[in-house]
Amino acid sequence: MVDFTAEEKAAITRLWGKMNVEEAGGKALGRLLIVYPWTQRFFDNFGNLSSASAIMGNPKVKAHGKKVLNSFGDAVKNPDNLKGTFAKLSELHCDKLLVDSENFRLLGNVLVIVLANHFGKEFTPQVQAAWQKMATGVASAVARKYH
């Protein structure tokens, strides 16, 4: 279980309220597929993933990235119950989709990079620490069924 301080929750919620989920989600998933190309194997039905520009411009990547980041919204709303919040997604990714659980950690790290790039000076080390903690907590919760 991840324990968030009131300050961490406030920092996460403050940034979340300013976030364009569609844009940030697409960028995060796109970066994951570019930086860690072996993750592309889970997205065979997404069409052209042959280059960085093809990936970043792919509407299916953008749509799925939005869907993924909307799930992070559930975490922002329920930071004290990440395991419960992600129980069904954990089961889906483990039992049906057979996604390597390490990919959730990688995606969380990429999301933190996307947020830092977008929010600049507003993404202070304290805000980064809060978001990194959230990303790690979400990755652990989604990977829970694997253990």
Curated annotation (Swiss-Prot):
<dbReference type="GO" id="GO:0046872">
    <property type="term" value="F:metal ion binding"/>
</dbReference>
<dbReference type="GO" id="GO:0042744">
    <property type="term" value="P:hydrogen peroxide catabolic process"/>
</dbReference>
<keyword id="KW-0408">Iron</keyword>
<dbReference type="GO" id="GO:0031838">
    <property type="term" value="C:haptoglobin-hemoglobin complex"/>
</dbReference>
<dbReference type="GO" id="GO:0072562">
    <property type="term" value="C:blood microparticle"/>
</dbReference>
<dbReference type="GO" id="GO:0005833">
    <property type="term" value="C:hemoglobin complex"/>
</dbReference>
<dbReference type="GO" id="GO:0043177">
    <property type="term" value="F:organic acid binding"/>
</dbReference>
<dbReference type="Pfam" id="PF00042">
    <property type="entry name" value="Globin"/>
</dbReference>
<dbReference type="InterPro" id="IPR002337">
    <property type="entry name" value="Hemoglobin_b"/>
</dbReference>
<comment type="similarity">
    <text>Belongs to the globin family.</text>
</comment>
<comment type="subunit">
    <text>Heterotetramer of two alpha chains and two gamma chains in fetal hemoglobin (Hb F).</text>
</comment>
<keyword id="KW-0561">Oxygen transport</keyword>
<dbReference type="InterPro" id="IPR000971">
    <property type="entry name" value="Globin"/>
</dbReference>
<feature type="binding site" description="proximal binding residue">
    <location>
        <position position="93"/>
    </location>
    <ligand>
        <name>heme b</name>
    </ligand>
</feature>
<keyword id="KW-0349">Heme</keyword>
<feature type="domain" description="Globin">
    <location>
        <begin position="3"/>
        <end position="147"/>
    </location>
</feature>
<comment type="function">
    <text>Gamma chains make up the fetal hemoglobin F, in combination with alpha chains.</text>
</comment>
<keyword id="KW-0813">Transport</keyword>
<dbReference type="InterPro" id="IPR050056">
    <property type="entry name" value="Hemoglobin_oxygen_transport"/>
</dbReference>
<dbReference type="GO" id="GO:0020037">
    <property type="term" value="F:heme binding"/>
</dbReference>
<protein>
    <recommendedName>
        <fullName>Hemoglobin subunit gamma</fullName>
    </recommendedName>
</protein>
<keyword id="KW-0479">Metal-binding</keyword>
<dbReference type="InterPro" id="IPR009050">
    <property type="entry name" value="Globin-like_sf"/>
</dbReference>
<dbReference type="GO" id="GO:0031720">
    <property type="term" value="F:haptoglobin binding"/>
</dbReference>
<dbReference type="GO" id="GO:0004601">
    <property type="term" value="F:peroxidase activity"/>
</dbReference>
<dbReference type="GO" id="GO:0005344">
    <property type="term" value="F:oxygen carrier activity"/>
</dbReference>
<feature type="binding site" description="distal binding residue">
    <location>
        <position position="64"/>
    </location>
    <ligand>
        <name>heme b</name>
    </ligand>
</feature>
<dbReference type="GO" id="GO:0019825">
    <property type="term" value="F:oxygen binding"/>
</dbReference>
<dbReference type="InterPro" id="IPR012292">
    <property type="entry name" value="Globin/Proto"/>
</dbReference>
